[in-house]
């Protein structure tokens, strides 16, 4: 009998960007993002983009976060005072 255990962890992090606070709650199953919620006091245009970012991250491995964030910003998303690196830092797991 072989038992296969994966580590299930919840993380919550606040990251202060130049012009806003990013709040992230991550539900990880091993190194995969099972669920994610991003909120904060920053502006993002188009306004529904945050949902798209969460959808892009959900199900991906944490090693792919940098690439996903950069791809997301390459789609024309604008976040005044908040840089792609701010989201990468907010999503960085200890």
Curated annotation (Swiss-Prot):
Pathway: Protein modification; protein lipoylation via exogenous pathway; protein N(6)-(lipoyl)lysine from lipoate: step 1/2; Protein modification; protein lipoylation via exogenous pathway; protein N(6)-(lipoyl)lysine from lipoate: step 2/2. It catalyses: L-lysyl-[lipoyl-carrier protein] + (R)-lipoate + ATP = N(6)-[(R)-lipoyl]-L-lysyl-[lipoyl-carrier protein] + AMP + diphosphate + H(+). GO terms for molecular function: ATP binding; lipoate-protein ligase activity. Its EC number is 6.3.1.20. One of its GO terms (biological process) is protein lipoylation. One of its GO terms (cellular component) is protein-containing complex. InterPro entries: Lipoate_protein_ligase_C (IPR019491), Octanoyltrans_LipM/LipL (IPR050664). It comes from the Archaea. It is an enzyme of class 6 (ligase). Keywords: ATP-binding, Ligase, Nucleotide-binding. Pfam families: Lip_prot_lig_C. Heterodimer composed of LplA and LplB. In contrast to E.coli, where the lipoate-protein ligase is encoded by a single gene product (LplA) with a large N-terminal domain and a small C-terminal domain, the same activity in T.acidophilum is dependent on two separate proteins, corresponding to the two domains of E.coli LplA, respectively. Part of a lipoate-protein ligase complex that catalyzes both the ATP-dependent activation of exogenously supplied lipoate to lipoyl-AMP and the transfer of the activated lipoyl onto the lipoyl domains of lipoate-dependent enzymes. Can also use octanoate as substrate. This is Lipoate-protein ligase A subunit 2. It comes from Thermoplasma acidophilum (strain ATCC 25905 / DSM 1728 / JCM 9062 / NBRC 15155 / AMRC-C165).
């Amino acid at each position: 009998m072989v038992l296969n255990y994966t580590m299930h962890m919840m993380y919550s992090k606040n990251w202060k960007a130049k012009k806003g606070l990013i709040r992230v709650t991550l539900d990880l199953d091993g190194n995969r993002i099972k669920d994610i919620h991003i909120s904060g006091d920053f502006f993002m245009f188009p306004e529904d983009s945050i949902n798209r970012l969460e959808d892009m991250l959900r199900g991906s491995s944490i090693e792919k976060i940098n690439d996903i964030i950069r791809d997301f910003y390459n789609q024309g998303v604008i976040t005044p005072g908040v840089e792609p690196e701010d989201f990468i830092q907010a999503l960085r797991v200890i």
